[in-house]
Structures are given as C-alpha cells and as structure tokens.
C-alpha cells in the first residue's frame, strides 16, 4: 500500500522513541522515512548528508532540521515533513544534542515558511520542551499544526 500524500505532516511521518548512535545515522533515518512516505527519491537522502557536512542543521532547543541541498529539489516528489524523536539524544557536534529531528523535503521555497513557523514554536520554551518529550504522535501533530498549515 503506498502512502497517501494527505498533507505536509501526517501521523505516518512521526516516529517517537527512536535511537541513533550518531548524527549520520539520525540523518539517514530521517531520509529513509521521507522515502518511505513517498515524498522523495532515494537520492535525496545523499543530499541530506551533503547539507549536514557543509553546514549544521541544528536549530537550537534540542531540534535539528535535516534537509537536502538547493539542487536536490529535483528529487522531491512533494513537500513533506518527517519528525523523529530521540529521547536519549544524538550528539550533533559542537556540544549540541538533538532530541528531535524535523526533516524537510520541499519542492520549492516552502522550507522558508516551515522554518519560520518552526522558529516561532521553538521560541516558546514550554512548547519546545513538550515537543522534545512528547509521548504520543497526536501531541506532536498538535504542536506542529502551525507548520502543517503553511502548506495551504
């Protein structure tokens, strides 16, 4: 059964309680989820690693936003988010620990709207903590609803 492209962020795109031994492994998991959602071609995952090697995608508040390079848009089938939570944290380098990865696949410039909405959410430290420590998918979907609405 193929995934239904029913929105920027769906329950199928949220994975809680994940584990990754490294930043590379976490980025790989993010990319593989985007592929399984039918949002990107497998080649997009390689560009996510390239982006991470050129500039960190760590955003702050324990959140990273893995995404591909500008040139990788050709591998994007539809704009989608994938959210992976790492309760034990992942070393993102430079003393930064990530507990939540919000992977972005954008066909155009939608990623700028997504980043803007995400920044507003993370500026609220209570919401940021709620997001990092979420125990169920619905909580994540509710907290990230403002981002999902940027698709409309």
Language model region names:
Residues 1-152:
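Cytosolic covalent-transfer regions centered on His/Cys nucleophiles
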């Amino acid at each position: 059964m193929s995934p239904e492209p029913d929105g920027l962020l769906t329950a199928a795109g949220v994975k809680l309680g994940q584990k990754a031994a490294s930043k590379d492994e976490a980025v790989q998991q993010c990319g593989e989820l985007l592929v399984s959602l039918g949002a990107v071609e497998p080649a997009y995952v390689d560009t996510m690693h390239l982006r991470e090697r050129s500039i960190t995608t760590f955003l702050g508040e324990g959140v990273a936003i893995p995404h591909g390079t500008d040139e990788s848009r050709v591998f994007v089938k539809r704009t989608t988010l994938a959210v992976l939570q790492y309760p034990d944290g992942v070393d993102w380098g430079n003393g930064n620990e990530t507990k939540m990865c919000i992977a972005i696949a954008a066909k155009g410039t939608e990623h700028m709207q997504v980043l803007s909405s995400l920044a507003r959410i993370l500026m609220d430290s209570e919401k940021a903590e709620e997001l990092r420590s979420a125990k169920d998918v619905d909580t994540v979907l509710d907290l990230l609803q403002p981002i999902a609405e940027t698709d409309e």
